[in-house]
Curated annotation (Swiss-Prot), chain A:
GO BP term, example: protein secretion
Keyword list, A-Z: Chloroplast, Membrane, Plastid, Protein transport, Thylakoid, Translocation, Transmembrane, Transmembrane helix, Transport
MF GO annotations: protein-transporting ATPase activity
GO cellular component assignments: chloroplast thylakoid membrane
Coiled coil regions in record: none
General function of this protein: Involved in protein export. Participates in an early event of protein translocation across the chloroplast thylakoid membrane (Potential).
Subcellular location, principal: plastid
Family: Belongs to the SecG family.
Organism annotation: Porphyra purpurea
Membrane topology recorded in Swiss-Prot or TrEMBL: Multi-pass membrane protein
Gene: secG
Name listed for the protein in its UniProt record: Probable protein-export membrane protein secG
Domain of life: Eukaryota
Keyword match Transmembrane helix: yes
Localisation per UniProt entry: Plastid, Chloroplast thylakoid membrane
Swiss-Prot record, chain B:
PANTHER family tied to this protein: SECY/SEC61-ALPHA FAMILY MEMBER
Gene3D superfamilies from the UniProt entry: SecY subunit domain
GO biological process: intracellular protein transmembrane transport; protein targeting
Membrane topology: Multi-pass membrane protein
Gene: secY
Organism: Porphyra purpurea
Keywords: Chloroplast, Membrane, Plastid, Protein transport, Thylakoid, Translocation, Transmembrane, Transmembrane helix, Transport
Annotated protein name in UniProt: Protein translocase subunit SecY
Compartment annotation: Plastid, Chloroplast thylakoid membrane
Length: 71, 411
């Protein structure tokens, strides 16, 4: 059981990091603070799907980590 | 009506993400004896310093222990690199939106690398407190901490994009605020201190004073009168309403955030080296060292100038003025205007940075005079960030409301 959980944890974590990295944020990070364009963002549909996937794996990651920590 | 609820949704979204970011600090990385670790690092200056940015997550080694730090550090590195490497500068200046997105993307990869390195260092560092220390443990904690840091980065981007305010600075804000109660109790309710109430009163007064000074510094602008072709015919008197605002502190909080993040570097390095000479040199720059303040002031100055050069480019302003058919009275358009603006910007930035540093210095002096301990972690760094972020966010909300009003007007 523990092994399976560990395995799932690894998978979800790696996918999570990967899915966060392939995001292409409109916001320009810390670099150019105060740029006026941030309110004119139009989210593309791929970005939407990606967001959902990321949220899913984020939840899984948190869940698995918590369970592993309790054990 | 709809714009109001839209704003409300943005604020709700932001708060939700902040709560989530806070929650992750308390989910521990598996396999570590957290109680023993916590007890041993409580008095460690480095850990306390790092806790400022991660909201206490560092001493509990939660999965969000690294927090936003890797992202900030890689932003600093990238900002510096864009000035050094011509290709990157070209990306930032000439390729417009797409180029900047590319730079953001590189920054994120760099953040991943940084997070991996840092979490690797942590997983080796906590070795004495681990139940079963082996290669698997290192792999797992590196993975967990790196993922945590990436999540925080993503959350900060989400806040910037879909919430309100700047995500990264809001997260730092929240972490500092969450450390405040602990800081207060440590400073004032320790059994060793006498005259607690007087000191507390003094502290409150100074605290308020610092906030006021900080607000003045952050809000101060130099207004350069401009005159446009349209006005010329109407009257010979300058319209007092048309001016070019140049802020005293162009970079806002960013110089302070960057400077204080860089200040953690010497403290880090002391953990890595065993060489006594190197250690002695490095300790000079640690929070209790004699050169700490000097380095801090130099960094604030450096990042202020650096930021001003990024945010405000005199050449661009001059070109824009020309396009608008406006000019500064008594200054020729073109090169003369550029030079004039550059001189003013340089002076403003120097003044602004000096002010910032003076405010940062106050807690140190107070500490010496009133012998209050532990004020440092709160004072110098945090207060400036707190005030700056609060002002920034309030402004962004205002801007948002106004821009929504314009939108509904044109519809």
């Amino acid at each position: 059981m523990e092994q399976i959980l560990k395995f799932l944890w690894y998978i979800s974590t790696i996918i999570l990091v990967f899915s966060i990295l392939i995001h292409n944020p409109k916001s320009e990070g810390l670099g150019t603070i105060g740029s006026q364009n941030q309110f004119f963002s139009n989210t593309r549909s791929t970005e939407n799907t990606l967001n959902k996937v990321t949220w899913l794996f984020l939840a899984l990651f948190l869940l698995f980590t918590t369970i592993l920590a309790i054990n | 009506m709809s714009q109001k609820s839209d704003l409300r949704n943005r604020i709700k979204f932001t708060l939700l993400l902040l709560v989530l970011a806070r929650l992750g600090i308390f989910i521990p990385v598996p396999g570590i004896d957290h109680d023993a670790f916590y007890a041993s690092v409580e008095k460690n200056t480095l850990v306390n310093f790092l806790n400022i940015f991660s909201g206490g997550g560092f001493s509990t080694i939660g999965i969000f222990a690294l927090g936003i730090v890797p992202y900030i550090n890689s932003s600093i590195v990238m900002q510096l690199l864009t000035k050094i490497i011509p290709d990157l500068e070209k990306l930032q200046k000439e390729e417009g939106e797409l180029g900047r997105q590319k730079i953001t993307q590189i920054t994120r990869y760099l953040a991943l690398g940084w997070a991996t390195l840092q979490s690797g260092a942590i997983s080796i560092w906590v070795k004495p407190y681990v139940f079963n220390w082996n290669f698997t443990f290192v792999c797992e904690s590196v993975l967990a901490l790196t993922a945590g840091s990436m999540i925080i980065m993503w959350l900060s981007e989400l806040i910037t994009e879909k919430g309100i305010g700047n995500g990264a600075s809001l997260l730092i804000f929240q972490n500092i605020v969450s450390g405040l109660p602990k800081n207060f109790t440590q400073s004032f309710f320790d059994a060793n201190y006498s005259n607690t109430s007087i000191k507390f009163g003094l502290f409150i007064v100074i605290f308020l004073l610092m906030i006021i000074i900080t607000i003045f510094v952050q809000e101060g602008t130099r207004r350069i009168k401009i005159i446009s072709a349209r006005q010329l015919g109407k009257s010979s008197i300058l319209d007092p309403n048309s001016y070019l605002p140049l802020k005293l502190n162009q970079g806002g909080v960013m110089p302070i955030v960057f400077a204080s993040a860089s200040m953690a570097l010497p403290a880090y390095l002391t953990q890595l080296t065993q060489n006594t000479f190197l250690l002695q040199v490095l300790y000079l720059f640690c929070p209790n060292g004699s050169l700490y303040l000097v380095l801090y002031s130099v960094l604030i100055l450096f990042f202020s100038y650096f930021y001003t050069s990024i945010v405000m480019n005199p050449e661009d302003i001059a070109t824009n003025l020309k396009k608008m058919g406006a000019s500064i009275p008594n200054i020729r358009p073109g090169q003369a205007t550029i030079d004039y603006l550059q001189v003013i910007l340089n002076r403003l930035t120097f003044l602004g940075a000096t002010f910032l540093f003076t405010v940062a210095l106050i807690p140190f002096i107070i500490e010496k005079v009133a012998q209050i301990q532990n004020l440092r972690g709160l004072g110098a760094t945090s207060l400036l960030i707190l005030v700056g972020v609060a002002i920034d966010t309030a402004k962004q909300i205002q801007t948002y409301v106004i821009s929504k009003k314009y939108d509904s007007m044109t519809k």
